[in-house]
């Protein structure tokens, strides 16, 4: 939104994308006085060139475009940082990974670059500029974060007359389920875990490695001592509910134009799995109120009906 040199009073407006991406900026967190985070803003022009201008067909072209990001007008160590989808390197541009490897391994040092990362850069060069950022913004939605909750106008297009009004009731249904699962975890977690929040956050170690030894080590570190085998299974189910509840918000489920598409159907499958696992913990009916909200999510294709009919179909698979 705006920037200023640390210690100065006057702000500079950068709201139209004119921020200098070659340095870091310090953002002071208003809700937590004294705390801050150092931020980097990627070079949009070079990033777009990598993604859309076929730079990845030639490693030399790639390096030369990076060199274009250097300016003699800057009197500080310049950071050239870009942000592109990983699928650009091979999926969208065949052998793009080879062009990247050629550039990184053989050419960038010859061009005068030093390969680094954000952490190392900050250790060497402290942020001396302050930044205020735009609230609720994203790279793929001009309306903030509307793409993940509303019929904001952002979609993949290709179908004149279609709308994405289904996003809001879908979001409301998932939020309802998420809130129910948060309450469930907070209540039940105390029965199984030394520290429920730590167990939840570090469950990723099991997700990444589901071997017997990995699961055993995780349980020894985070489970309350003396749990029976049955209780351990319940505890693992509780953690899996939390994982599935996060998967419900997978971004591609909101990206496309139609609720019956495979991406959105997949996040409804995650929701179905959440409700399936939760049945052993709850006596209350979650499916009825969940489907009641989803019936407002109308498909653009008449034969698919609403989100409720899609969820019911998913639940039967």
Q: Where are these predicted regions, by residue range?
A:
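Short secondary-structure transition/capping segments
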Residues: 4-7
